[in-house]
């Protein structure tokens, strides 16, 4: 298990755009399992939507991408290579249910 401090060593993102809280499983260069505890204090809930807060889908995708970039970036960092990893495109993305305050995202 890796906490937020380890995540910040690998990813360049910071509040409010660091969207993963913890890595709970990792196979470097292959996969990672992260979690994001979604709270009512997330800055995007103020405007999305008042009275019915929903996490924007693009931020759910961003959290998944950060998880994948961590899986690749940690090995690059350990090997002292440039840890910069970018995600360029996504096709056929579907959201099965809304993400609301109190939810825990399991990102794989």
Residue ranges: model-predicted function:
Residues 1, 68-108:
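Hydrophobic beta-strand-centered segment that forms part of the acyl-chain substrate-binding groove
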Residues 2-7:
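Short Pro/Gly-enriched beta-strand edge/turn motifs at strand-loop
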Residues 8, 51, 95-97:
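Beta-strand-rich interaction surfaces with strong enrichment in secreted/lumenal proteins
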Residues 15-55, 60:
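Catalytic strand-loop segment that frames the active site of acyl-thioester-processing enzymes
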Residues 55-56, 60-74:
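Active-site- and interface-proximal helix/loop "cap" or "latch" segments in soluble metabolic
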